Curated annotation (Swiss-Prot):
Part of the ABC transporter complex FbpABC involved in Fe(3+) ions import. Responsible for energy coupling to the transport system. The lineage of its organism: Bacteria, Pseudomonadati, Pseudomonadota, Gammaproteobacteria, Enterobacterales. The complex is composed of two ATP-binding proteins (FbpC), two transmembrane proteins (FbpB) and a solute-binding protein (FbpA). It is found in: Cell inner membrane. Residues 11-241 form the ABC transporter domain. This is Fe(3+) ions import ATP-binding protein FbpC 1.
Length: 352
C-alpha cells in the first residue's frame, strides 16, 4: 500500500484492477490518502488516471479490489451512497435553471427547507466570488464563472471527498491560473480530502499536496511536487516531469565527471556510487565566456520564449537543452560558450 505519510488513511484503494475485455487499464493499484489532502493523478493519455477517479466516484466498478472511504468499504455503493461530489471538465450545469437553482439542486434533492437552501446558495456563491449571481443563467456567464458555479455546487453539499476530472482544461491560460488558486484555497479552507485528475504538470504542482504519476495502469512514482521534479525515480519520470538532459557519468567522493568536466557532487547522491546515468534540468545550466575546454559548447538552436530563451547546444557531440535569461544574454546559433552545470539540478537515474 502506497501511503502519503503516517496519518490515518481516509480514502484507500486496495489492489484495484480494471479490465475492459482483454485490456487492463488499472493494474493492481494501491493507494492510501489521509484526511484533508489533495492528491493529483497525473500521466499521459490512456494511463488509467480517469478510470481511477471514476472508480472512486462509483461510476466504474473495479474488476478486482476494494475502495474504502472513511473506513467503510464502498466498492459496491453507487455515487449517491458515497458522500462524494465531482467537478467535471464540462461543468455539467443545467441550462434551464438559474445559477442559484443549479447550486442548490443537491440540497433540494435531499429535501432541505427552501430558506436553508437559499442561505447556503448565497454562502456558496460568496465563496467563489459570485455574490449576487443567483438569478443569472448559464448562457449569461463566462466559462470561468461556469466552473466556479460547478465548484460551488459541489462545496454546498459538504462532501467527505471531492473529485476533479480535468476541471480547467476548457479555460484559457490566465483563467486556469486563477481558478486553480481558488480550488486550492477552498480545498485547504474546508480540509476536504480531494482527488484531482489532469494532464497538465504545472496545474498538478500548483494544487497538490502530493502527485501520483501513472503510466500504463501502474503507479510510476508518488511524492510531493518538488520531490518528483528534483528526484525522479526513473528515466520515464525524468522526462515526463519536465525536460531533462541525460548523460553517462562517473563519480568520486566529491565530484561528478561528465566528459571530463568535474562538477561538485550533490548532497544526497548514494555513497559508493562509481558510475551511472545522470539527469540535468535545463535551468541548472548557464553559459559563460570563460571555462575549461571540457565545458566548451556550440549553440545550434535558439527559441525566444518571452522572459527566457530555450537554447540547444552541441556538447561533446551530444545535444543539450538549457534556459537563458533574455535580459542577460542574447545567444545566436553558431556562438561558442562554456557551460556551467549547477549541482542542484542534477539527479541519478535508474534504468527504468
Amino acid at each position: 500500500m502506497i501511503t502519503l505519510n503516517t496519518e490515518k488513511s481516509f480514502v484507500e484503494l486496495k489492489h484495484i484492477t480494471k479490465r475492459f475485455g482483454n485490456n487492463t487499464v488499472i493494474d493492481d493499484l494501491n493507494l492510501a490518502i489521509p484526511q484533508g489532502k489533495m492528491v493529483t493523478l497525473l500521466g499521459p493519455s490512456g494511463c488509467g488516471k480517469t478510470t481511477v477517479l471514476r472508480a472512486v466516484a462509483g461510476l466504474e466498478k473495479p474488476t478486482e479490489g476494494q475502495i474504502f472511504i472513511d473506513g467503510e468499504d464502498v466498492t459496491e455503493r453507487s455515487i449517491q451512497q458515497r458522500d462524494i461530489c465531482m467537478v467535471f471538465q464540462s461543468y455539467a450545469l443545467f441550462p434551464h435553471m438559474s445559477l442559484g437553482e443549479n447550486i442548490g439542486y443537491g440540497l433540494k434533492m435531499l429535501g432541505r427547507p427552501k430558506a436553508e437552501i437559499n442561505q447556503r446558495v448565497k454562502e456558496a456563491l460568496a465563496l467563489v466570488d459570485l455574490e449576487g449571481f443567483e438569478d443569472r443563467y448559464v448562457d449569461q456567464i463566462s466559462g470561468g464563472q461556469q466552473q466556479r458555479v460547478a465548484l460551488a455546487r459541489a462545496l454546498i453539499l459538504k462532501p467527505k471527498v471531492l473529485l476533479f476530472d480535468e476541471p480547467l482544461s476548457n479555460l484559457d491560460a490566465n483563467l486556469r491560473r486563477s481558478m486553480r488558486e481558488k480550488i486550492r484555497e477552498l480545498q485547504q479552507q474546508f480540509n476536504i480530502t480531494s482527488l484531482y485528475v489532469t494532464h497538465d504538470q504545472s496545474e498538478a504542482f500548483a494544487v497538490s499536496d502530493m502527485v501520483l504519476v501513472m503510466n500504463k495502469g501502474k503507479i510510476m512514482q508518488l511524492g510531493a511536487p518538488q520531490e518528483l521534479y528534483r528526484q525522479p525515480a526513473s528515466r520515464f519520470m525524468a522526462s515526463f516531469m519536465g525536460d531533462a538532459n541525460i548523460f553517462p557519468a562517473t563519480f568520486t567522493a566529491d565530484s561528478v565527471n561528465i566528459y571530463g568536466y568535474l562538477i561538485p557532487r550533490p548532497q544526497g547522491f548514494a555513497a559508493g556510487l562509481s558510475e551511472s546515468t545522470v539527469g540535468i534540468r535545463p535551468e541548472a545550466i548557464t553559459l559563460s565566456h570563460q571555462g575549461e575546454e571540457s565545458q566548451r559548447c556550440t549553440i545550434t538552436q535558439v527559441a525566444y520564449m518571452g522572459p527566457q530563451y530555450e537554447v540547444q547546444v552541441d556538447w561533446h557531440g551530444q545535444s543539450m537543452l538549457l534556459q537563458v535569461n533574455a535580459t542577460q544574454l542574447q545567444p545566436n546559433p553558431g556562438d561558442s560558450y562554456y557551460l556551467q552545470i549547477h549541482p542542484y539540478g542534477m539527479f541519478v537515474l535508474s534504468e527504468q
